[in-house]
């Protein structure tokens, strides 16, 4: 039904129009603009819903780069505008030009799953909620990815990333359990790396910090701390320009698309994995943790390492728990 008329038109360089605001928020008054029912009806008659439906399948199965575009377009299924329809055609044109650039897996890719996550603070001007996304790669290519909008309003970018880390952790745990049930426990013998580009969110997850910035966060999101203590995941800080999940949070420029797209779909190697914050130099790469003694004792218990008791209280506690 939709035809891409290339002609002399230049092919789009990004999956969603860069710096193109399709929200109904007036930039000056910050008020929501009224809905034009006549315009919406005309756009629906053009086949806007069919357009979005046709983009959802490739987004979910073969072309993760258009996930953010589908997430944005899906928010206007009832009352679309001409600008929204134009953005959808832009995405369709980009997909056509890159139809041969799907997901790639390689035998020399990462043998253990790796998760990258990101969020864009207050990306939605109407609700002040942030968009977030994550991708889990295995054997070089993405096997789980998502681009959504937070259901809660974050007060800072660190809080948004902390909530995103928790959402991504749920899928990581599902994958770890699946691999164990399939008979591949060696693939999840080590904690799964969770790579994000916000240092504060990474620190909240790794350390037992209660600050003015995170004390109000709902308890559900602090589940991530338990996963770190149990040695199931290991958050690490990655450079923002190397975070492939950035394409799930906002409309990126053509330069960012050119840099991240091949890494996201598995056609290019992942960025260099940062050094673990728990490992000190000079110990042959062994895990030497810098957190509090209780945290260390719990980690050693998970790894079946004899704990180093430094006080009678710790000995009594370990005896009571059967360590």
Please describe what each predicted stretch is:
Residues 1-323:
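Long, low-complexity, charge-biased intrinsically disordered regions
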């Amino acid at each position: 039904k939709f035809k891409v008329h290339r002609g002399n038109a230049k092919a789009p360089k990004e999956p969603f129009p860069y710096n193109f605001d399709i929200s109904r928020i007036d930039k000056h008054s910050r008020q929501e603009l009224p809905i034009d029912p006549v315009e919406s009806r005309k756009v629906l008659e053009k086949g806007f819903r069919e357009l979005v439906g046709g983009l959802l399948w490739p987004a979910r199965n073969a072309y993760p780069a258009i996930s953010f575009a589908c997430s944005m377009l899906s928010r206007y299924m009832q009352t679309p505008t001409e600008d929204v329809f134009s953005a959808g055609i832009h995405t369709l044109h980009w997909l056509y030009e890159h139809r041969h650039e799907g997901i790639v897996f390689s035998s020399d890719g990462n043998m253990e799953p790796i998760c990258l996550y990101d969020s864009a603070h207050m990306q939605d001007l109407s609700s002040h909620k942030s968009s977030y996304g994550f991708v889990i790669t295995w054997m070089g290519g993405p096997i789980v990815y998502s681009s959504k909008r937070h259901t809660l309003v974050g007060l800072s970018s660190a809080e948004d990333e902390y909530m995103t880390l928790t959402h991504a952790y749920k899928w990581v745990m599902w994958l770890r359990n699946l691999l164990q049930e399939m008979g591949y426990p060696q693939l999840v013998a080590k904690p799964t790396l969770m790579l994000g580009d916000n240092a504060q969110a990474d620190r909240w997850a790794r350390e037992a910090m209660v600050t003015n910035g995170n004390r109000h966060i709902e308890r559900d999101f602090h589940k991530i701390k338990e996963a770190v203590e149990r040695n199931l995941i290991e958050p690490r800080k990655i450079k923002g320009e190397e975070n492939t999940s950035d394409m799930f949070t906002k409309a990126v420029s053509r330069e960012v698309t050119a840099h991240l797209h091949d890494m996201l779909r598995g056609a290019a190697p992942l960025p260099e994995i940062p050094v673990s914050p728990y490992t000190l130099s000079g110990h042959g790469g062994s895990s030497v943790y810098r957190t509090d003694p209780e945290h260390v004792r719990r980690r050693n218990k998970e790894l079946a390492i004899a704990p180093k008791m430094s006080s009678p209280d710790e000995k009594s506690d370990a005896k009571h728990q059967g360590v």
